[in-house]
């Protein structure tokens, strides 16, 4: 479990053969203790869940405790985020994640990677968030097209126990595809692995750090099998010189990276059990699932230029499991001892929580069963949540059928009362409902391309009033509203502005003569549909195998 720190990145390319030794400030033969703490994919969860799980108040208590422990042992701590602070919880979204960034300040984050969901808002909002934050937003591979300059700091330098640590930030280049294209007219996302090679060389030539760490928002894919996603941390680690990074603190795929065997993650990691991080090409790769459910802790010993990992764990933040007792009653119980919430953090966050609560908790309707919007479903199969959303868009636009990315569905709605908060958790991005009138031939071409979007990615399509069989890149038995598509007939398709402008790699339709931007926000359209059609019958929206991939 060792990393040999070298003066440069070990001949990154043939042109990188020149080496330089770091300017050592550490003492020879002395062992230094360095602890790296990490989270990722926070997605607006500044407050505890309805079951009392996670939240920044408990996270602060945990981090403060670890800092105290490490300090007593003479060590130093670095706290990093793998990005995606934005989007997911209405109380946060309505306030541009101000409570989240202010809470992270109070915890003492040192740096964060810029995630793709940081671009769910215009750049002006992101710049305001940088002002709120007392830590740097890092990304070496995001550039402004018009100037050729980076939009964010590529790295930050920290000193812990006389050890000079460089932290590089990198962002998935899928952002341009899966983000809102309207916000990227002057932004370029370069290949992060290629940019990493350049930055490592620059650091070793100029800054001469003792240790280099990357905080990334790129995703962890077993054995580098990234499918239709952009390459992630595993692929990058393999492309770099061995051991050129001590560690990659990741995000984006929202997994607990706990390996069951070489190149294979545990399928159902149990909170509080041992977690073995991934190691590729001499580089450790870690990720702490999502939402602040865990704080990852990596304890290293640094001696004579070598970094040795001596302990790693994912620490659950008040995570609970549902237990059913012999009497038939059930309750949620903690996996690990409860972590108290920090009073100072509660004092900071309570006004933010209360600010949006009144409007969000108003009942707008009800449903008699689960509307399935879980990430593990909407990116793989057709769901009734997708059908409800598309039914709302079809009703508003008078469309014949509807299409949207499964990744745009962010939550389920449980049986019972539905609030506006529930709707905003399902559709938090503020996309506009649009439609396009297309010939039958154009419909065939469009759906043929959309049907190539693979499961296990946000691009996987949710469809309504459409049936087909997809095989080897072609569609057969294609029907709209149960009738075969007539090439000469005109059809109206409802979708979202995100997909219409090329988001998730969908065909652009905003340049078609029959394209109309309705101006209606997707969550508002869904809210009104629920109000007008409650109580909803969940079973009535259940997919019946209309579309299949062979």
UniProtKB/Swiss-Prot annotation:
Binding sites annotated in the UniProt record for substrate:
429, 498-504
Any single Pfam family the record assigns to this protein: Metallophos
Task: Report which residue ranges the record marks as coiled coil.
Answer: none
Q: Which cysteines are joined by disulfide bonds?
A: 258-275
Q: Which gene encodes it?
A: ushA
Give the protein name, as stated in the record. Protein UshA
PANTHER family (alphabetical): 5'-NUCLEOTIDASE-RELATED, PROTEIN USHA
Enzyme Commission number, as recorded: 3.6.1.45, 3.1.3.5
Record's subcellular location: Periplasm
Q: How is the cofactor bound?
A: Binds 2 Zn(2+) ions per subunit.
So what does this one do? Answer: Degradation of external UDP-glucose to uridine monophosphate and glucose-1-phosphate, which can then be used by the cell.
Task: Give the source species.
Answer: Salmonella pullorum
Q: Which residue positions does the secretion signal occupy?
A: 1-25
